[in-house]
């Protein structure tokens, strides 16, 4: 089991090495910006989709294009592009899922001209038939742009890729369930399991995760720690996860955009694969960047916390992330109504001092032990 966890850690910690490995094999890389992109299309057209969620880097050149109040995930993505960290990629796909993402694409065209920008425009009202048609039209634009880079599209290939991705989704949902029963898997290791998926082909990642599930299910769990549900856009900061482990907190479920939110919804496996993929987006819910008038995400967090016997909810708020800030008020009220302890910590990609986070989580730990 440790061998698998080490492989996943290496992939999560060394995305450039992963990228260079695929390039050395003659494969073409297409970067996928947060939060959701049609990876199945990219995969079906012969490219390797690779996540581009920024990194823990100082912002210098990105400030020439972005005001200070834009979220650091997107700003650091642009900074890495300018610095050459993504050199070798054939393109980047950036969705229109928040105000910051809507603006960064145009900046990317001028700041990183060596890596073509491919927009994917999603509708707010994604569930009606006209919303599905709009999503499909956006995907057709992506297909045309990828064809210019040498990719070829067919419904048959897309169906094959949908099956690959659905199997990976199932493995990730299953490992989430299994991890809830194994407190000995640390927050850092859990982060590696999910983060590594952005930097490996889905076939390779699925194979490792399925073996990990088998080994965990055959293993007796360790003594219980403090079970919590964690929520946010991104929770991969090593210092944050180290503090969670130090506080003996066990993540029994997550509502994290870069983790379980990616894998909740499968595309129907049908011959009209492009329509099916558009329907997948229509069927997605419970995310701050997806419009739902009644905000079912709030109930999902409370219900999941109860189902997994969590003692509390930790919201990790990415600084200047408007969609998450808007939802937090409703999440807080729902947790209070359910008598479910909740705390919030604010993070960004440039944080180097986590003393305030530590103090907050120490207090939260003491509260959960009462």
What are these regions (language model features)?
Residues 76-148:
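Acidic/His-rich segments in extracytoplasmic proteins that coordinate ligands and/or metal ions
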Residues 2, 329-370:
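Peripheral docking tails and interdomain loops at the edges
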Residues 292-339:
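C-terminal hydrophobic structural anchor segments
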Residues 35-36, 40-53, 232-304:
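Redox- and metal-dependent alpha/beta enzyme cores, enriched for Fe-S-associated oxidoreductases
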Residues 2-3, 9-19, 23, 28-40, ...:
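Metallocofactor- and cofactor-centric catalytic cores in central/energy metabolism, strongly enriched
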Residues 58-67, 126-131, 260-267, 353-355:
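Short, charged, surface-exposed secondary-structure boundary motifs
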Residues 2-28, 136, 140, 144-266, ...:
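A charged, amphipathic alpha-helical module
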Residues 66-83, 290-302:
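Glycine-rich, highly charged phosphate/nucleotide-binding loops
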């Amino acid at each position: 089991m440790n061998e698998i966890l080490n492989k996943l850690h290496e992939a999560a910690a060394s995305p450039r090495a992963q990228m260079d490995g695929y390039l050395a094999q003659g494969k073409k890389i297409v970067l996928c910006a947060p939060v959701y992109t049609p990876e199945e299309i990219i995969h079906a057209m012969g490219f390797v989709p690779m996540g581009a969620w920024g990194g823990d880097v100082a912002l210098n050149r990105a400030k020439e294009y972005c005001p200070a109040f834009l979220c650091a995930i997107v700003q650091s993505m642009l900074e890495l592009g300018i610095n050459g960290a993504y050199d070798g990629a054939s393109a980047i796909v950036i969705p229109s899922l928040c105000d910051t993402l809507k603006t960064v694409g145009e900046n990317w065209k001028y700041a990183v001209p060596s890596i073509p920008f491919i927009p994917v425009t999603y509708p707010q009202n994604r569930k009606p038939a006209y919303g599905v048609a709009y999503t499909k039209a956006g995907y057709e634009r992506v297909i045309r742009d990828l064809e210019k880079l040498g990719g070829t599209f067919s419904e048959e290939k897309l169906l094959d890729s949908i099956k690959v991705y659905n199997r990976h989704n199932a493995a990730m949902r299953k490992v989430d369930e299994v991890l809830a029963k194994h407190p000995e898997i640390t927050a850092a290791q859990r982060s590696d399991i999910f983060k590594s998926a952005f930097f490996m082909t889905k076939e390779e990642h699925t194979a490792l995760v399925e073996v990990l599930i088998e080994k965990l299910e055959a293993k007796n769990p360790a003594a219980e720690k403090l079970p919590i549900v964690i929520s946010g856009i991104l929770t991969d900061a090593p210092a944050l996860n180290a503090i969670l482990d130090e506080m003996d907190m066990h993540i029994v479920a997550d509502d994290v955009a870069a983790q379980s939110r990616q894998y909740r919804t499968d595309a129907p496996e049908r011959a009209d694969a492009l329509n099916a993929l558009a329907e997948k987006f229509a069927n997605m819910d419970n995310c701050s960047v997806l419009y739902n008038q009644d905000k079912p995400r709030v109930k999902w967090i409370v219900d999941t916390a109860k189902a997994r016997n969590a003692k509390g909810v930790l919201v990790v708020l990415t600084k200047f992330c408007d969609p998450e800030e808007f939802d937090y008020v409703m999440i807080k009220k729902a947790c209070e109504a359910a008598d479910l302890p909740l705390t919030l910590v604010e993070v960004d990609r440039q944080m180097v001092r986590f003393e305030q986070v530590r103090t907050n989580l120490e207090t939260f730990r003491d509260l959960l032990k009462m």
